[in-house]
Amino acid sequence: MPARAAPGAEGRFRAERELFGEKRGRNGSGRAVPCRPEGRMKKEQVAHCRFSVWYPLFRTVTIRSVILPLPDNVKEYLLDDGTLVVSGREDPPMHAQEGSDDAEEIQWSDDENTTTLKAPEFPEFTAKVEEAISSLGGSVFPKLNWSAPRDAYWIAMNSSLKCKALSDIFLLFKSSDFITRDLTQPFIHCTDDSPDPSLDYELVLRKWCELIPGAEFRCFVKENKLIGISQRDYTQYYDHISTQCEEICRSIQEFFEKHIQYKFLDEDFVFDVYRDSRGKVWLIDFNPFGEVTDSLLFTWDELTSGRNLKGDQSEEEATEQDYPVFRCTNSKVTVQPSPYLSYRLPKDFVDLSTGEDVHKLIDFLKLKRNQQDDD
């Protein structure tokens, strides 16, 4: 039975410590079992979660950012899976010593049919990106209209999404399934048959901040009421979350009522927040209220139907459903692997293992060498 806070002024938030594999609707790995929500997610709801739509409304309570239109030729380059070569790079000429194996290898490739892969150049766009990065302090967190390349952090030299140049951004974007989905299937899981809204793609650059994963929370809003809060990094146990759950819930609820409630364009939505060491809450992002968004320690069946959100509350307590259910990971849980680990083997590398595309490896190694030279 999940633990919950006692009712009263200090116990109006139901705090549940998740034991992976024991909660209804979850499998043994601890991930919420995907359920098609009873609600119907509309394309308009997804469009309202575009960064450029909500940022002007909430810029005072979120991280400073710059939004740049994404040119069509840059979009085409991001979707071109033929090469990992990044524009703006010039490789120094390679000279092999006479009699070396490298010299022999160069002779093998000296063929009239051999082509040299060269990345396209985007001088005007590059200049705008460099100016934006400089205005944000020299380091940024990149994303597109909706998604950040969180599934591609492993490919960066620092295993981070921290970018200092356009080449860093391109490397992450071209390695990310999340970015590809933004560009090709932005309205996946939407149930309405209306035409897709017209979209202008944008590169979003956010000022780099060192955020502690244990201070991030995902909040679920239905009919403009905050119904659930989940620890964002549910694969780890954080003692401060378990011991401060009442305080965390209260500060997030107050932030929601003051800055978010009735101000977003929909009444059903998901938003992410960060609570800093001083207890101040910051808005991080908005997401659609539907299965395209990870429900973390909830299931979409619970969130859309309300089942299991009241638990064993009395009728008196049930009337106070304005207060959200809070779920976090407890200390008994075995450390879980990151949900992004499954993205660590791109198709390009599968191609390499089958001998289908060795040129991609050459491009990748050149790029890594250039990054090391710059550092």
Which residues fall in each region the model found?
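Preference for protein termini
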Residues: 1-375
